[in-house]
Amino acid sequence: MKTLDEFIVEKQAEYPNAKGALTGILSSIRLVAKIIHRDINRAGLSNDILGYAGNQNVQGENQMKLDVFANDTFKRALMAREEVAGFASEEEDDFVAFDTERGRNARYIILTDPLDGSSNIDVNVAVGTIFSIYRRISPVGTPVTLEDFMQPGHKQVAAGYVVYGSSTMLVYTTGNGVNGFTYDPSLGVFCMSHENLQIPSTGRIYSINEGQYLKFPMGVKKYIKYCQEEDKATNRPYTSRYIGSLVSDFHRNMLKGGIYIYPNATNYPNGKLRLLYEGNPMAFLAEQAGGLANDGYNRILDIEPLELHQRVPFFVGSKEMVKKANEFMRDYPE
C-alpha cells in the first residue's frame, strides 16, 4: 500500500526541476494532522482540551481550547520549515510574517482554518483542518506583506483538508487531481485509500442549516423547496444532511454526491464562511474533483480578496446540483 510520503516523492520525481519545497510543507501538515488526531482522540479523557478557551477570535467567535491548540501547533510546525515565509489563520487577528533570515528567503505562504467545526468536539462529532498554499508575490529576501495573502484562489499551488472522524483522512490537491490518504495509527503513517477522487455529477444530498431558513435569500428558499419536492424523474426528494463542520459535510458530499450551501442571510449579509481559509481551498478541491464552487453567481476562485478575514456565500459540490441552485438564485433575485 502506498503511503503519503511515497506518493509525494513519486509526484515530485515527475518534475525534474522541483526542489522539494511542497514536499517539506506537506510533511509538516501531515505531522500537525497526527498531533491533532492524537489530542482529539483523547478529548473525552482530558478537560485540558475541552470547552472554551475564554477568548474570541477576530470574527467575534468564542474560541475552543482545541482551536487555540491547533492554531499554535500549526504555527510552530510551519515556522520550523525553511520553505514557509508566513502564515495566516482564521484564529489570528493578522497574518504572521516569519521574519527570520530563513523566513524572508522562503517562497511560500500558508493559510488555514486549523480546526473547522470545533464546537462539535465536546459531543464527539467529526471536525477538520483546512489548508491552502500560495507562492508569495513580494520580493524574496524581504518579510511577507498583506498582498501575499490577498491572492485569488486560482493562484493556489496546493490545498487540502484533514477530517478527524471514525478514521482520520488527509485529502489534498496540487492542481492535478485529488487524492485521499487514511491514517493508520498502528503504523503512524497515512496510506493511500482514495485515488483520483471525483465528485459525482449529481447526488441526493443537500447540506444547509435549515434552522436559518427564514433568514435566507428567496433563491435559496426556493431551492430548498425544490429539494424537498417529490419527483421520480430527478430522484427527489433529496436527503438533508448537515453536520455543522464544513470539512465533514464537504467530504461526505464529495464521496456520495451532493451540495453544500452556506448562503448570505439577514444575520450574515456577506455570508459566514471565510473566503481565504475555507472558500478558496475547498473550491480548489471541488473543481479538481469535477465539481463546482461559487457564491451563487460567481466562481469562488476568481474573487479578488479585499480583506484577510473576508466572508463569502458558498455553494459547492456536485456540478449539476450547484448549477440548479444557481438557477434559483438568478430567477429569484433579492
UniProtKB/Swiss-Prot annotation:
Residues annotated to bind Mg(2+) 2: 113, 116, 278
Cofactors? Mg(2+)
What EC number(s) does the entry state?
A: 3.1.3.11
Residues annotated as binding Mg(2+) 1: 90, 113, 115
Q: Where in the cell is it found?
A: Cytoplasm
Q: Which InterPro entries match?
A: FBPase_C_dom, FBPase_class-1, FBPase_N, FBPtase, Fructose_bisphosphatase_AS
Instruction: Return the HAMAP family for the record.
Output: FBPase_class1
**Protein name stated in the entry:** Fructose-1,6-bisphosphatase class 1
Identify the species of origin. Answer: Actinobacillus succinogenes (strain ATCC 55618 / DSM 22257 / CCUG 43843 / 130Z)
This chain is encoded by the gene named: fbp
